[in-house]
Design a protein with these regions (language model features):
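Periplasmic c-type cytochrome electron-transfer domains
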Residues: 2-69, 113-119, 138-153, 171-184
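Conserved short hydrophobic patches within well-ordered secondary structure
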Residues: 42, 46, 103, 125-130, ...
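Residue-level signal for pocket-adjacent positions within structured domains
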Residues: 56, 98, 130-133
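Short clusters of hydrophobic/aromatic residues that line enzyme substrate/ligand-binding pockets
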Residues: 61, 103, 135
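Gly/Gly-Pro-rich "capping" loops immediately C-terminal to redox-active cysteine motifs
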Residues: 68, 72, 84-124, 138
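The canonical Cys-X-X-Cys-His
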Residues: 71, 75-86, 135, 150-154
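Short alpha-helix boundary/capping motifs
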Residues: 99, 107-110, 150-154, 163, ...
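Short, Lys/Arg-rich amphipathic alpha-helical interaction segments
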Residues: 122, 128, 133-144, 148-168
C-alpha cells in the first residue's frame, strides 16, 4: 500500500516539478545556453527516420551547368546569409544554436558541406526545414524545381563545379541595407 501511495505522490509531483521548471525560465532558451540532455537525439533520430521514409531517390532535376548556376543564385539569395559562401563563412551563424553549418567548408573526412548526403535528403531539408535548429522550410518560398536546383548544387559541392558558378559563389554578399531616404 505504501508503494502505491508513494507512486501516486510521485506521479503528481513530477508534472508539477516540470511545470515549475518551465514556468520559472530554467530550460535553456538562449542560443548560448548548453543544450538539454538528449536534445540532439530528440530532433535527429525522428528527422532521419522521416527523411528515410520520404526520400526521393531519383531527383527530377539533374546537376547540369544551368541548374548549378540557377542553384547558386538561389543559394546566394536564400541560404548564404546563414550557411556562408565559398571561402566566406557567415559570421552571424556563430550566434545561432545549433550553429548553422558552413556548406562550402570541408568537415570530417574532407567532405564539403552536405555533399555526402544524397540530393533527396538535402531537398527534404530545404523543403521542410529542421525544427529546433533555425533552419526554415522553403516550400512556400521556392518552387519544386528551385529547391532541387539548390539541392543539386550542395550535393555537388565537393565535385568540380563550372567556373562561372564558382565565381558567383566566391562573391561576397552585400548585406548592408541601403540607407533609408527621409520621407516628408
Amino acid at each position: 500500500m505504501r508503494f502505491l501511495v508513494g507512486l501516486l505522490i510521485g506521479l503528481l509531483i513530477f508534472p508539477i516539478a516540470i511545470a515549475a521548471y518551465l514556468k520559472f525560465g530554467q530550460p535553456p532558451v538562449a542560443t548560448a545556453d548548453a543544450p538539454l540532455p538528449f536534445e540532439a537525439f530528440i530532433v535527429h533520430i525522428p528527422m532521419h527516420a522521416r527523411i528515410d521514409r520520404e526520400l526521393v531517390k531519383t531527383p527530377p532535376v539533374g546537376p547540369s551547368a544551368t541548374n548549378l548556376m540557377i542553384g547558386a543564385h538561389i543559394y546566394r539569395k536564400q541560404c548564404a546569409a546563414c550557411h556562408g559562401l565559398y571561402g566566406l563563412p557567415a559570421s552571424f551563424a556563430k550566434g545561432m544554436f545549433p550553429e548553422a553549418p558552413q556548406l562550402w567548408e570541408p568537415h570530417g573526412n574532407g567532405v564539403v558541406g552536405v555533399s555526402d548526403d544524397p540530393p533527396g535528403e538535402t531537398y527534404w531539408k530545404v523543403a521542410n526545414g529542421i525544427r529546433l535548429s533555425g533552419m526554415p522550410g522553403f516550400k512556400k518560398v521556392l518552387n519544386e524545381t528551385e529547391m532541387w536546383q539548390v539541392s543539386q548544387l550542395l550535393a555537388n559541392a565537393d565535385k568540380p563545379i563550372p567556373s562561372d558558378v564558382m565565381t558567383l559563389l566566391k562573391q561576397p554578399l552585400d548585406l548592408d541595407p541601403a540607407p533609408a531616404t527621409p520621407t516628408q
